[in-house]
Amino acid sequence: MKDTIRQLIQQALDQLTADGTLPAGLTPDIQVENTKDRSHGDFASNIAMMLAKPAGMKPRDLAARLVEAIPAHEQLAKVEIAGPGFLNFFQDHVWLAASLDRALADERLGVRKAGPAQRVVIDLSSPNLAKEMHVGHLRSTIIGDAVARVLEFLGDTVIRQNHVGDWGTQFGMLLAYLEEQPVDAEAELHDLEVFYRAAKKRFDESPEFADRARELVVKLQAGDPDCLRLWTRFNEISLSHCQKVYDRLGVKLSMADVMGESAYNDDLAQVVADLTAKGLLTEDNGALCVFLEEFRNAEGNPLPVIVQKAGGGYLYATTDLAAMRYRHNVLHADRVLYFVDQRQALHFQQVFEVARRAGFVPAGMELEHMGFGTMNGADGRPFKTRDGGTVKLIDLLEEAESRAYALVKERNEQRAERGEEPFDEVQLREIGRVVGIDSVKYADLSKHRTSDYSFNFELMLSFEGNTAPYLLYACTRVASVFRKLGQGREQLGGKIVLEQPQELALAAQLAQFGDLINNVALKGVPHLLCAYLYELAGLFSSFYEHCPILTAEDPAQKDSRLRLAALTGRTLEQGLELLGLKTLERM
């Protein structure tokens, strides 16, 4: 609908330009937003206020000319002027109802695929191997997964790339520890965190051990067979731990998506050679760097992008440049999205610029850093265990499931007291699993990607507010309507007729699903989808309360309201699926 309104406004602008009301050459970015109060229309635009000055007119006068010039359209009932010159657009209720009937008959809920389709590489999760995933890996993993799902739904070809840290000093440290204590260490491999901490303790306390670790890194990089065999074993164990977490989270990541730092080792020397050939490298204290004039420190000096250390070693920037070239040359990406901590913003700005100057990626290939804030504890400080250690992600998920199980078990006892059929233990465990994992994911996804947030089990497991349990309950509420009816959603007759205010409000929200999904894909911000679903659930609750469904006044009204309920249920389920969340028929 927003695209239609933009097109109508553009047609009006073209007409006013042709008759001399507007000067030629204006190319405004036409903004169309949802109104906060639907009594003032469904959508609003500030285009008249934007163009009043170049037109030499008062905003309301220009708005009046625009209203006259906007062509009539079946989707619009009327256009009004509000305040200092806003244009308020009212949807035609008959057209709106018919569009929802079409959406209900469509497996895609009326959401058109975006065109032309792109090949999009999603760089997500990317934990360092040789130790277990911790809570800091949650955001990249689930935000990246949600955006990938949305892009796939809109027709893009999505290539997930798990750029794991499988190379570097930590492996020399682990190899040295395994060399010292082969029997005990092999046993400890099943708990990577214990093994890693023990090796790190030796590395920090013993200069001799640290020297040996560095020697083994050199041997590993030189292709020593024994070192490579053990390194491979470390990675296999570490990746198996990661996969268990991915499976528990329900994200679409598998071993086939792993493309770690080591995959680019053979290209790093060539990256440096190509940068040299382009005349981009400068030697600085033995290191090879690219200096970009637009990136300067506090003293005003250009900041270096170091691609090779004085000792010959390579850095993250070198690997990232090799990965960008691979993603262009081999994966043929049109767009690459990096879901990496916001604190790496400068790094990505620099390497993106170096990649373009070096010709590693073409001008038309989009490189976007989808930075995110940090997850903190309830006290607002970095999330730690009680003894100050790192919280394993798997432990967090297990606690979430345990807490959710206790919650649903308590509610199950209340069901029995009310005379309702209680769930058995198997059902309770499954409900607890879904509620627990969904709650952790939704609490994160519902926050703006770039914001920090405080992790709080009590808030995220609440059945009130913008939470997963609230939305899951909304889904079960819709399902209960059709259980009582004894009929499936796909067997409905009649058509939608919008009469009551609650019906109109619900219908207007349902009609915006496609626009919303496209916005999430464009900006990489799943919280917009969360906010949409939360508002949709609230509007359905109001509709359910004020508009009797199964006891409607006549069959036509009953059919209409059943169809609205069915479309609401399907939209909630589709939206939650795009976020990577499971749904329940009963809870």
UniProtKB/Swiss-Prot annotation:
Q: Where in the cell is it found?
A: Cytoplasm
Q: Which parts pass through the membrane?
A: none
Supply the EC number(s).
Answer: 6.1.1.19
Q: Cellular component terms, GO, for this chain's entry?
A: cytoplasm
Q: Which UniProt keywords apply?
A: Aminoacyl-tRNA synthetase, ATP-binding, Cytoplasm, Ligase, Nucleotide-binding, Protein biosynthesis
Q: Pinpoint motif 'HIGH' region by residue range.
A: 127-137
Under catalytic activity, the entry for this protein gives: tRNA(Arg) + L-arginine + ATP = L-arginyl-tRNA(Arg) + AMP + diphosphate
Write out the GO MF terms. Answer: arginine-tRNA ligase activity; ATP binding
Q: Gene3D superfamilies per the record?
A: Arginyl tRNA synthetase N-terminal domain (3.30.1360.70), HUPs (3.40.50.620), Isoleucyl-tRNA Synthetase, Domain 1 (1.10.730.10)
Q: Which Pfam families match?
A: Arg_tRNA_synt_N, DALR_1, tRNA-synt_1d
Please give the positions of the paired cysteines in each disulfide bond: none
Q: Which domain of life is it from?
A: Bacteria
Q: What class of enzyme is it?
A: ligase
Gene Ontology terms describing biological process? arginyl-tRNA aminoacylation
**Quaternary structure annotation from Swiss-Prot or TrEMBL:** Monomer.
User: What family is it from?
Assistant: Belongs to the class-I aminoacyl-tRNA synthetase family.
The name under which this protein is listed is: Arginine--tRNA ligase
Q: What's the source species for this entry? A: Pseudomonas aeruginosa (strain UCBPP-PA14)
Lineage, highest ranks first: Bacteria, Pseudomonadati, Pseudomonadota, Gammaproteobacteria, Pseudomonadales
